């Protein structure tokens, strides 16, 4: 983030804090803002002129887009209502939403077909020109689309907006406002009557819902205000040739912006949307009802109801629930259900959806029952503040068709937006063809996170290709684990807060046992090494000596182990670091380790002379550059869970060939 952006963000955040002090009731904030915006629109003034004098002065960064302020006010209201802190809560910026909409309208299903290739007459000898002219006329006749026909205009406004247009989480109407602005921009050269008629058609084709009465009321008022700002609604009269009267506009908007629960309710329109674009709430069940005296009971009841909910057809509505109930995953599945076959769905979701295990059923639904054709991926450091600590993704799906190729754009930055188009042509992307994609992911349809730099991209894709067909680390019957008991990934036995009295700083006194934490494992010269004062002849950092000794029960010490440090900083050069902890140490639960079957440890001792030497050999292999590239590519988020470690592709290589720990068998065919 640049210094100017930082200062503007700080300035606007300070304004919201001052507003909370002046007007603590958030519904009043929203109501006053909407009333002031309406009054300023009627008088053709900036909104600052209509705000109460007791309100803090609007900073320059908020003057130009009243809708953005409304989005933030509603986002803060929603956070407080759920018991979450409103600090650090942001709404998607207009520039981001415009990019999604322009990309869909220009380059999605609604784009006009490319004109067929014709022959240039000037480039041909005179004797060929008569033939070429007739050839070109035939081509044009075959390729023309009659835009006046019913087929060409049935589900499309003159401005090119597919209808019905839906948003099942309309919020304060952000997507609706931006689509109306694009609509007005495209009709700028049309007659006033045509603009009015096409605007009526678009309004009647809106399908906007939300579970919050406050959101629905905000969206309704915002749409009318924006239409007036665009010269399409008359706020003080019955309208004219180019403008809709306020009462008529409000009647249509009230009918098509409704307060319902799209997850548990029925869609109130007979015709499903042809274009659905939304940013569903990025909430887990445990994010709901925080601070409520009966929050736990309410969360359990809601989770149970959503898992078992049946629609009007008597069938369970949500088939892709796995693990905890996350609302954005339910909204994704519901959006596919609501849309017409052949309709388009664009959703703004956390990037974890692309790789996390719990989203696997949803990805299968996207790929195997629909045409998931595109995804944009913005990493955590892309300056999209509304993503918080998570990456942001935008998925594009054609409902009910077959997925052959997914085009993955990313990692993207805010500089990759192109005004009026979507993304710049230089935005990095790669294509996942269904066959290789299925092989890479064992048909989990995860989307890898590929670096932006061209050489790093090539190395990562090569690593994925080389490792995809290797056995997984915990598999049985492999060269590492020939027996029938699988390798387990576990965490160290000592939880720091529970054993705080038994943990102290390292002093070197007799009776102290080395206590190994994640901070003691570092990557140096291509190896994972322990930086613990008990193993170092030279002084170590205070961080490494603090809380590094165990004075509790001796039986908590463990045999030699191969351990893994998960590096949670996305800016770090590595994601996983493997090292060997010698016998006689105590492990904290910030460190994961491999629980190896007896047959594996015996095999390592026989081949390498000692268990520690065998584990050191394995650690060297696990610290390979290829495996690190793999782990970064398939990381669901900054956290490393056991499943990610378990599914690492691993095959023991020695002297350029694979080998097995089976007795009397050196190499595998």
Regions found by a protein language model. Name each.
Residues 159-162, 169-170, 201-205, 252-254, ...:
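Short, well-ordered loop/turn elements at secondary-structure boundaries
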